[in-house]
Amino acid sequence: MINIFSFICIYLHSALYSSSFFFGKLPEAYAFLNPIVDVMPVIPLFFFLLAFVWQAAVSFR
Protein backbone atom coordinates (compact mmCIF):
# COMPACT_ATOMS: atom_id res chain seq x y z
CA MET A 1 0.00 0.00 0.00
CA ILE A 2 2.82 2.40 0.81
CA ASN A 3 4.27 1.86 -2.66
CA ILE A 4 1.04 3.01 -4.32
CA PHE A 5 0.92 6.07 -2.06
CA SER A 6 4.55 6.89 -2.86
CA PHE A 7 3.89 6.51 -6.58
CA ILE A 8 0.92 8.89 -6.38
CA CYS A 9 2.95 11.46 -4.44
CA ILE A 10 5.82 11.27 -6.91
CA TYR A 11 3.39 11.54 -9.83
CA LEU A 12 1.68 14.60 -8.36
CA HIS A 13 5.01 16.23 -7.56
CA SER A 14 6.30 15.70 -11.09
CA ALA A 15 3.00 16.79 -12.63
CA LEU A 16 2.97 20.03 -10.68
CA TYR A 17 6.59 21.02 -11.18
CA SER A 18 7.75 19.40 -14.41
CA SER A 19 6.21 21.98 -16.71
CA SER A 20 8.37 24.76 -15.29
CA PHE A 21 11.65 22.81 -15.42
CA PHE A 22 11.57 20.49 -18.42
CA PHE A 23 9.29 22.20 -20.93
CA GLY A 24 9.39 25.58 -22.61
CA LYS A 25 6.59 28.08 -22.74
CA LEU A 26 3.78 27.82 -25.23
CA PRO A 27 3.97 30.15 -28.22
CA GLU A 28 2.31 33.50 -27.62
CA ALA A 29 -0.64 32.62 -29.85
CA TYR A 30 -1.48 29.71 -27.52
CA ALA A 31 -0.84 31.50 -24.23
CA PHE A 32 -4.57 31.40 -23.39
CA LEU A 33 -4.29 27.58 -23.15
CA ASN A 34 -1.73 27.71 -20.31
CA PRO A 35 -4.26 26.83 -17.54
CA ILE A 36 -5.49 23.80 -19.51
CA VAL A 37 -1.96 22.62 -20.25
CA ASP A 38 -1.07 22.91 -16.55
CA VAL A 39 -3.94 20.56 -15.61
CA MET A 40 -3.41 18.00 -18.40
CA PRO A 41 -0.72 15.88 -16.63
CA VAL A 42 -3.14 15.22 -13.74
CA ILE A 43 -5.99 13.93 -15.96
CA PRO A 44 -4.80 10.26 -15.90
CA LEU A 45 -4.99 10.40 -12.10
CA PHE A 46 -8.68 11.26 -12.36
CA PHE A 47 -9.28 8.06 -14.33
CA PHE A 48 -7.36 6.12 -11.67
CA LEU A 49 -9.57 7.57 -8.94
CA LEU A 50 -12.68 7.01 -11.05
CA ALA A 51 -11.93 3.28 -11.04
CA PHE A 52 -12.20 3.23 -7.23
CA VAL A 53 -15.41 5.26 -7.25
CA TRP A 54 -16.88 2.88 -9.81
CA GLN A 55 -15.89 -0.17 -7.77
CA ALA A 56 -17.37 1.39 -4.64
CA ALA A 57 -20.61 1.97 -6.56
CA VAL A 58 -20.84 -1.74 -7.42
CA SER A 59 -19.70 -2.80 -3.93
CA PHE A 60 -16.30 -4.12 -5.06
CA ARG A 61 -17.71 -7.21 -6.76
From Swiss-Prot:
Origin: domain of life: Eukaryota
Transmembrane regions: 40-60
InterPro entries, per the entry: PSII_PsbK, PSII_PsbK_sf
Keyword Electron transport listed: no
Predominant subcellular localization, coarse grouping: plastid
Gene Ontology terms: biological process: photosynthesis
Cell compartments where the protein resides: Plastid, Chloroplast thylakoid membrane
Any one of the GO CC terms: photosystem II reaction center
Keywords carried by this UniProt record: Chloroplast, Membrane, Photosynthesis, Photosystem II, Plastid, Reaction center, Thylakoid, Transmembrane, Transmembrane helix
Keyword match GTP-binding: no
Pfam hit, one: PsbK
Membrane topology per record: Single-pass membrane protein
Annotated propeptide span(s): 1-24
Function: One of the components of the core complex of photosystem II (PSII). PSII is a light-driven water:plastoquinone oxidoreductase that uses light energy to abstract electrons from H(2)O, generating O(2) and a proton gradient subsequently used for ATP formation. It consists of a core antenna complex that captures photons, and an electron transfer chain that converts photonic excitation into a charge separation.
Record text on subunit structure and interactions: PSII is composed of 1 copy each of membrane proteins PsbA, PsbB, PsbC, PsbD, PsbE, PsbF, PsbH, PsbI, PsbJ, PsbK, PsbL, PsbM, PsbT, PsbX, PsbY, PsbZ, Psb30/Ycf12, at least 3 peripheral proteins of the oxygen-evolving complex and a large number of cofactors. It forms dimeric complexes.
Homology family: Belongs to the PsbK family.
Protein name (record): Photosystem II reaction center protein K
Protein source organism: Pelargonium hortorum (Common geranium)
